[in-house]
Amino acid sequence: MVSARIVVLLAVLLCAAAAVASSWEDDNHHHHGGHKSGRCVRRCEDRPWHQRPRCLEQCREEEREKRQERSRHEADDRSGEGSSEDEREREQEKEEKQKDRRPYVFDRRSFRRVVRSEQGSLRVLRPFDEVSRLLRGIRDYRVAVLEANPRSFVVPSHTDAHCIGYVAEGEGVVTTIENGERRSYTIKQGHVFVAPAGAVTYLANTDGRKKLVITKILHTISVPGEFQFFFGPGGRNPESFLSSFSKSIQRAAYKTSSDRLERLFGRHGQDKGIIVRATEEQTRELRRHASEGGHGPHWPLPPFGESRGPYSLLDQRPSIANQHGQLYEADARSFHDLAEHDVSVSFANITAGSMSAPLYNTRSFKIAYVPNGKGYAEIVCPHRQSQGGESERERGKGRRSEEEEESSEEQEEVGQGYHTIRARLSPGTAFVVPAGHPFVAVASRDSNLQIVCFEVHADRNEKVFLAGADNVLQKLDRVAKALSFASKAEEVDEVLGSRREKGFLPGPKESGGHEEREQEEEEREERHGGRGERERHGREEREKEEEEREGRHGRGRREEVAETLLRMVTARM
């Protein structure tokens, strides 16, 4: 009788072993099932013998539930066109989110070289409305940086865009021909000049040692955000637009032979590029014909007179100055050439370890470029919060979407209804601050931070400071302070009036450049784009390999399970 019971028990346990082994083998074909099921079975071996059958049954039940959940997800993914559209929409939102992660900041790699030669280059930022819908307000403007090597010459051309330039480094000569009149002026660091659309313009770097670097914005007039260069003098490189006229038109226009025209405008013409090498004698001759640029406010002011030539910004009295920095500004009042374009130009020099006082512009869109120094900027942006809201529905559709959302929010420092976009600033970085958006720039502890700013829609713009002397919050009346801050007006006054400096303040006190290291880490992650995605993919690949190895040894595992159950029965006997 006892032997019969033992035989029955042995048969039951062998059937259970076969069922568990079969279940484990089936699960081996799923992404996470095989190796987890195997671990579950191995844990059961450590249990007392009378608990092991129940443990094995629980392993099987867990795997069955996981398979059903995976099947539901797969069915949802294949549930038809609507589901596919949702998936595509989610992917599109994700791509847009990655693309629009920081729409206001552009490092050197964001610029595209449109001119490249041995003697220099011209780099241009792509149209703002292609970067983000948030930048449509300045879609008519482009940012460009010209670099010309010592003793180089930029051949004459005209464009269908107004050019407003700031000489960030070096010196040279700029010539414009407008209304039949040629004007040549010397330019140097700190000069601001305007080259109108359609005016033939050329320039030369007359220095024998330093590069000439000009930062400029182009105000497009034909197609918003698009501009073209037109080279009259030229040949093969650059190609002269004159060569595109028919031969008969060329001969009639210049009253000369086709051979001579070919030598000037055709394939036998100039082929050294847009920026060419000039001799010392040639640059000296160009300089000899140029008058000294850089007039100041002693020139007749509008409406009594017009500006002639560049405006020497750094030779003027700074509008704000203290031990933490200086701000130099030129607007339509001081430099009449800017009036037509509704643009002001400024230069900020922030002392090492200091920062600009938090502020916002009431009307202007700030387009900024860093020629020298290092630091970081913070821009407070409510639009980023609303964009994040578009992803709310993703949060209920899977853990992976939630993790991506949380990761993005951490990188962009979500605040109380706002996002703070932090950007590391270094030479060649450009950034944009829309009207009304508070921002601050901080210089590193190792060097001053220099920023050139072009402020679009400058007419009647006001800089509103949020800290330091004359900050707008101090001007609230006592009742408004008490109600707004939920504190006593005296305490509010004490905090808001703690800084006496205007415009520039001492920087954060954290030692060791913690903020800069944090920003470098964020940008390193952003440069690698989907680093987290690649790590996840790598984990999946490793799990798959482990799964395959376990699959190859599946038969041995089944035998181990059966052997374990036999040992259990034998021990009981």
Swiss-Prot record:
Q: Which residues are glycosylated?
A: 349
Give the molecular function GO annotations.
nutrient reservoir activity
Sorted keywords for this record are:
Glycoprotein, Seed storage protein, Signal, Storage protein
Q: Spans of biased composition, class Acidic residues?
A: 403-413
Q: Pro-peptide positions?
A: 19-86
- Source species of the chain: Zea mays
Q: Where is this region: Disordered?
A: 65-102, 288-315, 382-416, 498-573
* Comp. bias regions, Basic and acidic residues: 390-402, 525-542, 549-561
- Tell me which residues make up the Cupin type-1 domain: 104-262, 311-493
Source domain of life: Eukaryota
Q: Which CDD domains match?
A: cupin_7S_vicilin-like_C, cupin_7S_vicilin-like_N
What is the protein name stated in its UniProt record?
Globulin-1 S allele
Query: One of this protein's Pfam families, by short name?
Result: Cupin_1
Q: Would you indicate the residue range of the signal peptide?
A: 1-18
Q: What PTMs does it carry?
A: Three protein-processing steps occur in the formation of the mature protein from the primary translation product.
- InterPro entries in UniProt: Cupin_1, RmlC-like_jellyroll, RmlC_Cupin_sf, Seed_Storage-Functional
Q: Which family does it belong to?
A: Belongs to the 7S seed storage protein family.
Q: Which residues form a coiled coil?
A: none
